[in-house]
Amino acid sequence: DIFDNLKLRVGYGTAGNDNIDDNMYATSYGSGHYGIGGKDYITYVPGKTLGNKDLKWEKTETVNVGLDVSVFGSRLNVGIDWYNNTSKNLLIKNQIPSSTGYTTQYQNVGSIRNRGVEIVINATPVRTKDFTWSTDFNVAFNRSKVLDIYGGSSESDYFIQDYESRMGFKIEKGKPLGQFYGLVYDGLYTTADFIQNEDGTYKLKDGIASLKGFDRKSVKPGDVKYKALSGETDANGNPVWSVNDRTVIGNASPDFTGGWNNTFTYKGFDLTVFMNFSVGNDVFNMSTQRFVGPYLANQNTISDMANRYTLIDPLTGKETTNLARLAELNPGEDNGSRMWNISSNNKYAISDHS
């Protein structure tokens, strides 16, 4: 026989999400104390989460088709699975207006789909009396898609921002999950972006973009630039950037993931070597975001800060406004790896992590 095992598998299932707090349909209250006139009065205190009587069960429907094949005396085994998982009535603790007296409320916010293929290969290339080598390889391809967002179409319905990192994620109907959303880093302002005034100061050239509503006279060489994608201009026709220039700048979801495991056995000894890999995903580097910038007194920074842009002339110990001198102090100032004032959610902190 060619096959030691040949099996076709088809499965369907549905399940809820049990990782949700209890009784979120009800609004809870606590007690507090209020002193007045020398007396202590007991009052009620609202909780943090407002109940939602319209909550529905979150439900995931799973369809799976698989094929298992074993040959060569089961020394080579291959498993292939195709799956399609659809989650509806997703339950998320959403922020709500403070005017309600609460901060959050569990809501059914939408539906998503995860579809993909998983391949597992197990083999025993060598098997002798004293020595055995067995190897396992797996690779998985997953594609997510937001199928629906319930009850809204404004940006606040699909834009989530982490407070600590200030990195935004855009959740958009018809698009995959994991989209990084922010400004596109465009390097630093260099001396070529400015004109030297007769009094020794400098000013930003016309046509060079700046932050909307920010005084162009305050922009300095070494400040960070972002791309003005929306076409907005100021009163003088100069391009400006703002929150309207945010766009998708990466995706945290990999194109595929996998692993390779090898076990070598010799008599009573064994050695296992394994590796995992992820290809095509972007990573937000919070260390770059947190430890790069001009406002880091009395704390450590990353080594990249040693190559930061400087406005201080070491000959005088003071800030210089002479553009020629600044160019001398900052050779390669147009190199995108130089930095000084990095803030906000932007593409500088996003990198390919394959």
Language model features with spans:
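Outer/extracellular conduits and scaffolds centered on Gram-negative outer-membrane beta-barrels
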Residues: D1-H33, G47-T49, K53-S354
